[in-house]
């Protein structure tokens, strides 16, 4: 028996096997994760002996014209790799932590996850079905420690069976989840006949999904060209080629340390070339464990090497996430949130208070977002204008908006603060109607400078005299700090850092 999300019966089928036709189906996507519920009932002479409920989503995945299509649309994969890791539970991740991860992903405009490099807790797939995330579901194959090329286990016949068995377990366990749109055969195992045979097995078992493998390269048995850490030039080279496969990097934009300064350039290319459809950032969360420092007693997050020299350690290398172990946002998370946002202001005309709003979604409007424009003068807030005209903008559509209120507010700012820097900050904030998205959460933002900062022009001789006159110097045994009207300079034994004040 199949029921809609409200429990209304749609259709039934009887027998050991059967099929149901669903009229006017509500299709599942990560943007619109509609789920039906199927009840499989086993009966005997006394009646029902067992009832199994199963949530069901209907969607289509295919590759056409070098693009990955979901329900006929060439989606953008705004993805991240996610290891199962918890600062308190280690490899044991609670449902509450999983939901927290999905909430953060929604906040950061992440719509896809690669289950690196193994099948996850079954509850994770249920949650992705429910809340809406696209999954590349990866089998637990990784053997690059044994070597590549001729040393790869993918070339040894005696290892064919485990290659197939591990993918069989992955596919057969999770085949009914609509959130899974791609199967991944494994990670960093080299390439050989074992993967070619495994690819054929998966395609025979499930004809509804593409199959990818990173080491498959351009021409081998992978439906998606999915390399890792390819730079801009090589990415653009493939996009300009006659390659017939979608280009979606399985790992890119490595998020370790002070990172993501080059994220914009990737997304400029993704939005330029149709076959370049995104990628999966490495990776989602710093892999650290909550503990106390043996020296200070304060709480820290530990990593490789903190518990002795064995087993082998790469020290802090696995702390390369968008977010910290306790799920606080790392600074570069905001860069990712911005360049992956789903709504954009274009062609801003400040004189007339006019601009275009582009909805980058493929399946939903932006009626759940409220647009405001806040005007600042030299960083001081002047006023905020509400702009309700964004309602009804269809997916992939653009709407011209003219706001008299914004035009007036900008005019007032220019007349009273004409010598100051004036900016207009647009913000699309959630109305709280979407699951796991808080009311007021800003999902997209842009800033436009309508009056540049006016730097005072001072003759060089005067500037040098003023700088010397106003210089203040402080010294300790190891550090010297010099402060002027123009800069702060900090000097130590072998380094000097100068920070300008303007």
Question: Model-predicted segments: where are they?
Answer:
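Intrinsically disordered, low-complexity Pro/Gly/Ser/Thr-rich segments with frequent PxxP/GP/PP motifs
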Residues: 9-24, 376-420, 436
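Extracellular Ig-like/FN3 beta-sandwich strand-entry sites
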Residues: 31-37, 368, 398, 417-423
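Terminal connector regions
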Residues: 42-52, 408-462
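Extended substrate-binding grooves/exosites of carbohydrate-active enzymes
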Residues: 47-356, 360-383
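Beta-strand-rich N-terminal accessory domains
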Residues: 425, 430, 456-502
């Amino acid at each position: 028996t199949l029921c809609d999300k409200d429990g209304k019966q749609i259709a039934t089928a009887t027998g050991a096997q059967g099929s149901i036709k669903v009229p006017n189906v509500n299709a599942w996507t990560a943007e619109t994760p509609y789920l039906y519920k199927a009840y499989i009932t086993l009966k005997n002479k006394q009646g029902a002996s067992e009832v199994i409920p199963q949530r069901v989503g209907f969607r289509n995945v295919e590759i056409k014209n070098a693009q990955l299509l979901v329900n006929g649309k060439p989606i953008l994969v705004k993805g991240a790799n996610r290891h199962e890791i918890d600062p308190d539970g280690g490899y044991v991740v609670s449902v509450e932590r999983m939901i927290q991860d999905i909430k953060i992903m929604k906040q950061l405009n992440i719509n896809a996850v690669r289950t690196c490099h193994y099948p996850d807790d079954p509850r994770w797939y249920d949650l992705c079905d429910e809340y809406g995330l696209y999954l590349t579901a990866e089998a637990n194959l990784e053997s690059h420690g044994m070597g590549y090329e001729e040393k790869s286990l993918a070339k040894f016949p005696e290892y064919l069976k485990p290659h197939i068995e591990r993918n069989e377990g992955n596919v057969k366990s999770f085949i009914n989840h609509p959130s899974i749109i791609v199967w991944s055969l494994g990670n960093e195992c080299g390439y050989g006949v074992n993967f070619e045979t495994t690819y054929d097995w998966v395609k025979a078992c499930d004809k509804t999904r593409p199959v990818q493998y990173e080491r498959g390269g351009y021409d081998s048995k992978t439906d998606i060209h999915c390399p890792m850490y390819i730079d801009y030039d090589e990415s653009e080279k493939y996009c300009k080629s006659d390659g017939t496969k979608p280009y979606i990097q399985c790992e890119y934009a490595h998020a370790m340390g002070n990172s993501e300064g080059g994220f914009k350039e990737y997304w400029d290319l993704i939005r330029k070339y149709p076959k370049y459809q995104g990628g999966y950032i490495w990776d989602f969360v710093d892999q650290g464990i909550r503990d106390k420092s043996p020296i200070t007693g304060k709480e820290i997050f530990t990593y490789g090497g903190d518990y002795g020299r064995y087993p082998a350690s790469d020290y802090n290398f696995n702390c390369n996430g968008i977010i910290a172990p306790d799920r606080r946002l790392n600074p570069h998370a905001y860069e990712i949130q911005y360049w992956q946002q789903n709504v954009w202001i274009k062609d801003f005309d400040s004189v007339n208070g006019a601009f275009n709003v582009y909805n980058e979604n493929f399946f939903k409007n932006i009626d759940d977002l409220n647009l405001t424009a806040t005007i600042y003068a030299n960083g001081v807030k002047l006023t905020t204008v509400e702009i309700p005209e964004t309602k009804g903008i269809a997916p992939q559509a653009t709407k011209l908006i003219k706001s008299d209120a914004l035009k007036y507010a900008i005019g007032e700012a220019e007349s009273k603060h004409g010598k100051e820097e004036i900016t207009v900050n647009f913000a699309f904030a959630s109305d709280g109607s979407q699951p796991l998205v808080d009311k007021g959460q800003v999902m997209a933002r842009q800033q436009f400078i309508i009056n540049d900062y006016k730097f005072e022009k001072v003759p060089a001789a005067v500037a040098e005299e003023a700088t010397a006159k106003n210089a203040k110097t402080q010294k300790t045994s190891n550090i010297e700090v010099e402060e002027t009207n123009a800069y702060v300079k900090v000097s130590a034994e072998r380094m000097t850092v100068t920070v300008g004040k303007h």
